[in-house]
Amino acid sequence: MSFASTLYKTVFKRNSVFVGTVFASAFVFQAAFDTGVTSWYENHNKGKLWKDIKGGIMNGGEEDEEDDE
């Protein structure tokens, strides 16, 4: 039995199985793509994101600032 025949019998023969396969594949692809893009974005913008600068801002900011008197 060829691969195409097996694929047809398991996925494409019944519309309900085909639609379920499409939805499941889209869900898995979306999760993997989102994780990959988020990881790339956070690495590309390291030091500029809120989670990176939050501690400095919440603790009063930088110590190098001088008051104008």
Swiss-Prot record:
Query: Per the record's keyword annotation, is DNA-binding included, yes or no?
Result: no
Q: Which residues lie on this side of the membrane: Mitochondrial intermembrane?
A: 45-69
- Mitochondrial matrix topology ranges: 1-18
Renumbered to this chain, the signal peptide range is: none
State any GO BP term from the record: mitochondrial electron transport, ubiquinol to cytochrome c
Q: Which GO terms describe its cellular component?
A: mitochondrial inner membrane; respiratory chain complex III
Tell me the superkingdom of the source.
Eukaryota
Where does the protein end up?
Mitochondrion inner membrane
The UniProt transmembrane annotation reads 19-44
Bilayer disposition of the protein: Single-pass membrane protein
Enumerate the UniProt keywords alphabetically.
Electron transport, Membrane, Mitochondrion, Mitochondrion inner membrane, Respiratory chain, Transmembrane, Transmembrane helix, Transport
Q: Chief localization class?
A: mitochondrion
Complexes and interactors: Component of the ubiquinol-cytochrome c oxidoreductase (cytochrome b-c1 complex, complex III, CIII), a multisubunit enzyme composed of 3 respiratory subunits cytochrome b, cytochrome c1 and Rieske protein, 2 core protein subunits, and additional low-molecular weight protein subunits. The complex exists as an obligatory dimer and forms supercomplexes (SCs) in the inner mitochondrial membrane with cytochrome c oxidase (complex IV, CIV).
Which family is this sequence assigned to? Belongs to the UQCR10/QCR9 family.
PANTHER family reported in the protein's UniProt record: CYTOCHROME B-C1 COMPLEX SUBUNIT 9, UBIQUINOL-CYTOCHROME C REDUCTASE COMPLEX, SUBUNIT X
What function is annotated for this protein?
Answer: Component of the ubiquinol-cytochrome c oxidoreductase, a multisubunit transmembrane complex that is part of the mitochondrial electron transport chain which drives oxidative phosphorylation.
List the protein's name.
Answer: Cytochrome b-c1 complex subunit 9
UniProt organism field: Kluyveromyces lactis (strain ATCC 8585 / CBS 2359 / DSM 70799 / NBRC 1267 / NRRL Y-1140 / WM37) (Yeast)
Q: What is the lineage of its organism?
A: Eukaryota, Fungi, Dikarya, Ascomycota, Saccharomycotina
